[in-house]
């Protein structure tokens, strides 16, 4: 629930353990999603499969009707972000022109442009558990990174999820300064099937926030240098 408070608003909710917790803020953002603007297309008449107006496509961005493609916010099951739509558009255009192209969701970052920034790509721990994937986790706090502190960004962390046996990078999740820039390294690592060792062996310039990526990989391998394992 949301209540008035001297600060502005008070949000009362329950945590994972069922305990009642509250937060106060000047403003409350209600983010409940958006409807696809497809009503005028009369998808049913075109026999284009959809879910409440969100169009179903394959990895070529082709709909249930051969030769008809859809991209962006009207597509079902994908983040409504500009770079997502752009990547989909390139894939659709390549296939329309007779080339072979496929959209890869696992390398598509989701980003939240706030303060601090947040970004994520690949699998989460919950998804690994649901899929029966054995994994290990590495973390590194922004508070232990010099450049992050210079940018007044000591809050947050980098979290890397990797396969337990071979160390292949499965997911990366970041909260902190320049997270929406840093996440591209995670997408590259996943797309290139890089391992923790390969990320560790890559020299990251100093002082930069990118060092947190390597430090998180070191932590996953129990080889941390600037934090505890």
PLM-predicted stretches and their roles:
Residues 16-20:
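Glycine-centered tight beta-turn/hairpin loop motif at sheet-sheet or coil-to-beta transitions
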Residues 1, 47, 60, 159-161:
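Short, surface-exposed charged micro-motifs
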Residues 97, 114-124, 129-229:
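Flexible, glycine-rich terminal cap/loop adjacent to redox cofactors
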Residues 8-14, 48-56, 143:
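Short gly/ser/thr-rich secondary-structure transition/capping motifs
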Residues 15, 58-59, 163-164:
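Short, acidic, Ser/Thr-enriched surface-loop or helix-capping motifs
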Residues 1-8:
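A conserved short coil-to-beta-strand element within the FAD-binding core of flavoproteins
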């Amino acid at each position: 629930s949301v209540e008035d408070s001297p600060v502005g608003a008070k949000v009362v909710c329950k945590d994972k353990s069922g305990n009642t917790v509250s937060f106060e803020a000047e403003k409350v953002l209600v983010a409940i999603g958006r409807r696809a603007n497809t009503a005028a297309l009369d998808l049913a008449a075109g026999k284009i499969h959809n879910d409440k107006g969100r169009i179903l496509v394959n990895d070529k961005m082709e709909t249930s009707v051969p030769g008809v493609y859809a991209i962006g916010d009207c597509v079902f099951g994908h983040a409504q972000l500009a770079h997502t739509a752009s990547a989909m558009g390139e894939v659709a255009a390549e296939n329309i022109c007779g080339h072979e192209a496929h959209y890869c969701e696992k390398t598509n970052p989701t980003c939240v442009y706030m303060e601090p920034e947040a970004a994520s790509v690949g699998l989460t721990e919950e998804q690994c558990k649901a899929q029966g994937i054995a994994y290990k986790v590495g973390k590194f706090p922004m508070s232990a990174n010099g450049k992050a502190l210079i940018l007044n960004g000591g809050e947050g962390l980098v979290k890397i999820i990797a396969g337990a046996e071979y160390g292949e990078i499965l997911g990366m999740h970041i909260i902190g300064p320049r997270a929406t820039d840093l996440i591209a390294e995670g997408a590259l690592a996943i797309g290139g099937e890089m391992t923790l060792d390969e990320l560790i062996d890559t020299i990251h310039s100093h002082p930069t926030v990118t060092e947190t990526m390597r430090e998180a990989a070191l932590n996953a391998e129990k080889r941390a240098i600037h934090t505890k394992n």
